[in-house]
A protein has these predicted regions:
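Elongated, mostly alpha-helical coiled-coil "stalk/stator" tethers of large membrane protein machines
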Residues: 1-100
Length: 100
């Protein structure tokens, strides 16, 4: 299920962008997806004591020099309560780049 949702987000992310822009976004999302391997990180994201806005800000703080489109994308994921699919999105984005 997460894979299907991730594919839709990747399609929206890739449409209208050149390979260099997509590769840069992929690099940034890969940095964040590595954090999902940490139990502490996952406990923060799954905590009901922390609202989605704060979780989104937390993830954005991990991304060095995020461009506005990536920042808006992460905010959208936060609003839709989909921050947990960032690793799937990063994987699908790598797959999509290989096809470009």
């Amino acid at each position: 299920m997460k894979d299907l949702v991730a594919k839709r987000y990747v399609k929206a992310l890739v449409d209208g962008r050149d390979l260099n822009s997509v590769a840069l976004i992929s690099e940034k999302l890969n940095e964040v997806s590595k954090a999902f391997k940490s139990d502490k990180f996952n406990s923060i994201l799954s905590s009901s004591d922390i609202n989605e806005v704060e979780k989104t800000k937390f993830i954005l703080s991990m991304i060095d020099k995020a461009d506005k489109s990536l920042e808006n994308f992460i905010k959208l994921l936060g609003e839709k309560r989909r921050l947990d699919i960032i690793p799937e999105i990063a994987f699908e984005l790598k797959t999509q780049i290989a096809k470009m």
